[in-house]
Swiss-Prot record:
This is Probable potassium transport system protein Kup. The chain crosses the membrane at residues 7-27, 44-64, 95-115, 133-153, 165-185, 199-219, 243-263, 290-310, 338-358, 370-390, 395-415, 422-442. GO terms for molecular function: potassium ion transmembrane transporter activity; symporter activity. InterPro entries: K+_transporter, K_trans_C, K_trans_N, Kup. Belongs to the HAK/KUP transporter (TC 2.A.72) family. One of its GO terms (cellular component) is plasma membrane. It holds the Pfam family K_trans. It is a multi-pass membrane protein. Its main location: membrane. The keyword GTP-binding does not apply. It comes from the Bacteria. It comes from Erythrobacter litoralis (strain HTCC2594). HAMAP family: Kup (MF_01522). It is found in: Cell inner membrane.
Length: 622
């Protein structure tokens, strides 16, 4: 088995869980949701046709074929796309708008990562009611136990159970495809839905009701943005192979199978079957095993979304949109497997509240969709900038492509906006809160750097004056600096209060690049300023762990050498003071100050040895 096939199999277990569990509720919701459709031949074929063409246009063409070509050194996702585009449009008038769009798409993802575990696990456990209606009262308790267990297990990492993900998902996809195929063979007339005529006829006959149905049909493509975000783990080739060669055919067979079953029924029988078409495809004796298999699949889908939240948060920290948080690496073999406690517990609380508030997957479906369609629409806008600004397409080639996708994505987003009163407000509120936090932190850090640079002493002047103004003591002192310009405040405070300078003083800056990984040969820079004072820079990509002691080992190739037992680290801890200077509104200053107080220490974030760290306070007015 070649490496591409192995990676494709691995991707089936990790990447496609979200979109793979959509058949549990997507088709059903068009007929039982807030705007239910009448159950008849034309409506069933219209919905199945819409699902087929939505999956083809949005997932297969927009994401897998076009956007997956837009990788930032192998990484995908909104933030990676923004970093890629920013290098080409940084000095243009719309560069700031590109960044804001990418940050808002990322903010919407957090709302999605709260809803996905709740709706996925609930929809699977609700299958118990199909097996035995008397189990209705156990659905929410079982779902809550499973979800709490999922979040509690996060700190142990997924390395041990991750090997089971691909086999379970392969069995799951094979089973749902087989059940769908059996139903299609029994009622092959459902295959007429391959013809877009039935989707068009649906809109001609039903107009606004068909438009509202888009809000439920879009549930079939939830998880498409996650495919792009997870591209860095497996690569474009293996993911295209697994999507076109296995996942997409399996999903379509199941959707067409559900449609075939409903088409064959009428009246009360159809009304009863539409409540759980996914589970009713299976013979009665196999429904309980299908419930168990679907529960495992939703567990894996939820795991993928939670891991995605950790990964995106880590990227946002490195790119300067989120304060330093405690990031724990759960695998020595895979640097991408991380655990962020504060994100984990915040997601768990939100998911529990969602389950208790909405009570069932059908109610939750109303909240689902806005975050996904919002992110997809933003990705389409970013794609327009990518085609013209980065790939240098002529506008008359790019315009038709972008317009087609904007019409499709915009229609889905508009249809989902009608669900705001029924629960769609939730991901929007989460997105706005997260967007406010991310932009407040980025703006506050920018203002802090500007204020500190205004009063910073040039390093050359400091080196000349320090030679005669302080007693030199043995050893090496490393002063962490956020900028390569000027003297760090911790160094000035050390001179002011302690009146000493170490024999070797190193001003160290950690710089995060807008690429995921930095070539180890370009990791460090090391130069002498004079009077025993040196400038050192460590370069990292936004996907890498910023472990300074490990990074200092690479300094040997740049001319520096460090003995940790003879080295002390000096850090500055800033305190904000109110200021009359124009910067941010007071309410945002208070939010920024709160985020600054609760951020992880530089000692923890950079992996510094606790017994070798000295922290000095400083005050900043923004």
């Amino acid at each position: 088995m070649d490496s591409t096939t192995k990676l494709a199999i691995g991707a089936i277990g990790i990447v496609f869980g979200d979109i793979g569990t959509s058949p549990l509720y997507a088709f059903r919701e068009t007929f039982v949701g807030p705007n239910p459709l009448p159950i008849d031949y034309n409506h069933v074929l219209g919905v199945v046709s819409l699902i087929f063409w939505s999956m083809t246009l949005i997932v297969a063409i927009q994401y897998v074929t076009i956007l997956m070509r837009a990788d930032n050194k192998g990484q995908g996702g909104s933030l990676a796309l923004v970093a890629l585009i920013s290098r080409s449009v940084r000095n243009t008038n719309y560069g700031w708008l590109v960044v804001l769009l990418g940050v808002f798409a990322t903010s919407l993802f957090y709302g999605d990562s709260m809803i996905t575990p709740a709706i996925s696990v609930l929809s699977a456990v609700e299958g118990l009611v199909v097996v035995d209606p008397e189990l209705q009262g156990f659905v929410i308790p079982i779902a809550l136990v499973l979800l709490v267990g999922l979040f509690v297990l996060q700190k142990r990492g997924t390395a041990k159970v991750g090997a089971l993900f691909a086999p379970v998902m392969i069995v799951y996809f094979t089973v749902i495809a087989t059940l769908g195929l059996i139903s299609i063979v029994q009622h092959p007339e459902i295959l007429y839905a391959l013809n877009p005529y039935y989707a068009v006829l649906f809109f001609i006959n039903d107009g606004f009701l068909a438009f509202l149905a888009l809000g439920s049909v879009v549930l079939a493509v939830t998880g498409s943005e996650a495919l792009y975000s997870d591209m860095g783990h497996f690569g474009r080739g293996p993911m295209k192979l697994s999507w076109f060669g296995f996942v997409m055919p399996c999903l379509l067979l199941n959707y067409f199978g559900q449609g075939a079953m409903i088409v064959s029924l009428s009246g009360p029988e159809a009304q009863e079957a539409i409540q759980a078409p996914f589970f009713l495809l299976a013979p009665e004796m196999l429904r309980l095993p299908l419930v168990i298999l679907a529960t495992f699949a939703t567990f894996i889908a939820s795991q993928a979304v939670i891991s995605g939240a950790f990964s995106i948060t880590h990227q946002a920290i490195q790119l300067g949109f989120v304060p330093r948080l405690s990031v724990r690496h759960t695998s020595d073999a895979h640097s991408g497997q991380i655990y962020i406690p504060v994100i984990n517990w915040a997601l768990m609380v939100a998911v529990i509240l969602l389950v208790l508030t909405f009570q069932n997957s059908s109610n939750l479906a109303s909240a689902y969709g806005i975050a996904v369609t919002g992110a997809v629409t933003i990705d389409t806008l970013l794609m327009a900038v990518l085609l013209v600004g980065v790939w240098k397409w002529k506008w008359y080639y790019a315009a038709p492509v972008v317009i087609v996708f904007l019409i499709i994505d915009g229609a889905y987003f508009a249809a989902n906006l009608t669900k705001v009163p029924d629960g769609g407000w939730f991901p929007l509120v989460v997105g706005l809160i997260v967007f406010t936090l991310l932009t407040t932190w980025a703006r506050g850090r920018k203002l802090m750097r500007e204020r500190m640079s205004e009063v910073a002493l040039p390093i050359e002047i400091f080196a000349k004056s320090a030679h005669n103004s302080a007693t030199r003591v043995p050893g090496t002192a490393i002063f962490m600096a956020s900028s390569t310009a000027g003297v760090p405040s911790a160094l000035l405070h050390n001179i002011k209060h302690n009146k000493v300078l170490h024999e070797r003083v190193v001003i160290l800056t950690v710089e995060i690049s807008d690429i995921p990984y930095v070539d180890p040969a370009k990791r460090c820079e090391y130069s002498e300023i004079g009077q025993g004072i040196y400038r050192a820079i460590l370069h990292y990509g936004f996907m890498e762990e910023t472990n300074v002691p490990e990074g200092l080992k690479s300094m040997q190739q740049c001319g520096g050498e460090f003995d940790m037992m003879q080295t002390s680290f000096f850090l500055s801890r800033q305190t904000l003071l109110p200021s009359d200077k124009p910067g941010m509104p007071i309410w945002r200053e208070k939010i920024f100050a709160w985020m600054l107080r609760n951020a992880a220490t530089a000692m923890e974030f950079f992996g510094l040895p606790t017994n070798r760290v000295v922290e000095l306070g400083s005050q900043v007015r923004i």
